[in-house]
């Protein structure tokens, strides 16, 4: 994988380990991250939610993994900045970049409009109605704190007067920020304040359609779409037994999101099938221009899926 044109990431099951009975097995997350690095994966990722979909906290989990890995990038897929204070968050992410020696990628989103997420924002003291403008101000503030010596900012939600963040990231231009932008308004926002496009495209055709729209918006606004890194978040279950793969996918999606599988499958990138079919599925996205694929496995056998994917699927699609 390190020799190919495409980068591959593994999303750690930080929600599943919390959903399981008993005390969450954090050690298994470390083991899986080390295994992924050993298999040649280029990055490991953690999701984010405080209340709506409980899981291990992303940044502290990645900090622990940073101490046990040497090469893999460490990313969030995806993080919800609007739930945090921008100065504290900028400091925490810069600290993670220092711990990992410059390996952090921040995949971010504005949060889905569901009752559980709205309740989560309310409990965290954030007005859900203003989450987009809060998000925009936080991204702008963090970028400036990471790269400027003294920052003054007077926005609708946050005001800073001559603030200096003494803890700067190792990455001199700041932390790369990828955005899950699938519609026109988020895509326009991404062109202004993002570094990468990180959709959950349901097919290679949808990925191509989305990117074509971004290029058109960039041309219209006079911005450079070529600077954006093109990534994908996708969920796989690789199994020669198609029926078993579909059963595990349905159980995973419905348990994870507390929503019907059919509802989520209409908009999310999900695949079930054997090795050859998985190769064809991923190759389609590579041909569509995907530069990084972040893979989530919808299986209770995470180690088995990780091995099967790395040994039999990925070498064939990225040669």
Residue ranges and their predicted role:
Residues 2-22, 82-152, 205-212:
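Flexible, glycine-rich active-site loops centered on histidine and acidic residues
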Residues 12-27, 79-86, 171-182, 236-237, ...:
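Active-site mouth loops of central-metabolism enzymes
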Residues 8-12, 44-46, 74-76, 104-108, ...:
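Hydrophobic faces of well-ordered beta-strands that scaffold small-molecule active sites
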Residues 36, 40, 48, 65, ...:
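Conserved, mostly hydrophobic/aromatic
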Residues 23-36, 89-92, 179-189, 274-284:
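Short, acidic/polar
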Residues 1-21, 113-119, 156-175, 242-269:
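N-terminal small/glycine-rich loop or linker at the start of catalytic domains
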Residues 1-68, 173-175, 296:
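N-terminal beta1-alpha1-beta2 module of alpha/beta enzyme domains
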Residues 56-76, 134-141, 309-319:
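Alpha-helix-loop-beta-strand connector modules within alpha/beta enzyme cores
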């Amino acid at each position: 994988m390190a020799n190919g044109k495409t980068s591959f990431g593994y999303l750690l099951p930080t929600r599943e380990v919390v959903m399981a009975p008993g005390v969450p097995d954090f050690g298994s997350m470390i083991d899986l991250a080390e295994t992924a690095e050993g298999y040649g994966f280029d990055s490991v990722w953690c999701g984010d939610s405080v209340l709506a979909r409980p899981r291990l906290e992303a940044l502290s989990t990645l900090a622990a993994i940073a101490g046990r890995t040497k090469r893999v990038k460490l990313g969030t897929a995806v993080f919800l900045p609007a739930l945090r204070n921008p100065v504290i968050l900028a400091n925490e992410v810069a600290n993670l970049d220092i711990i990992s020696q410059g390996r952090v990628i921040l995949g971010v989103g504005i949060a889905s409009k569901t009752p559980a997420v709205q309740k989560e924002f309310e409990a965290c003291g954030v007005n859900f109605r203003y989450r987009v403008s809060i998000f925009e101000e936080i991204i702008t503030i963090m970028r400036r704190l990471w790269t400027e010596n003294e920052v003054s900012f007077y926005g609708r939600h946050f005001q800073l007067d001559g603030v200096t963040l003494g803890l700067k990231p190792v990455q001199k231009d700041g932390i790369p920020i990828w955005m899950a932008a699938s519609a026109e308004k988020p895509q326009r926002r991404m062109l202004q304040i993002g570094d990468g496009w990180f959709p959950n495209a349901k097919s290679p055709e949808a990925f191509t359609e989305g990117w074509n729209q971004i290029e058109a918006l960039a041309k219209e606004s006079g911005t450079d779409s070529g600077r954006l890194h093109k990534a994908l978040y996708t969920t796989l279950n690789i199994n020669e037994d198609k029926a078993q793969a579909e059963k595990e996918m349905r159980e995973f999606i419905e348990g994870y999101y507390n929503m019907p599988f059919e509802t989520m499958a209409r908009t999310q990138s999900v695949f079930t099938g054997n090795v050859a079919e998985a190769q064809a599925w991923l190759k389609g996205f590579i041909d569509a221009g995907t530069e990084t694929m972040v893979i989530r496995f919808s299986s209770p056998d995470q180690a088995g899926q990780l091995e099967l994917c790395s040994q039999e699927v990925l070498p064939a699609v990225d040669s």
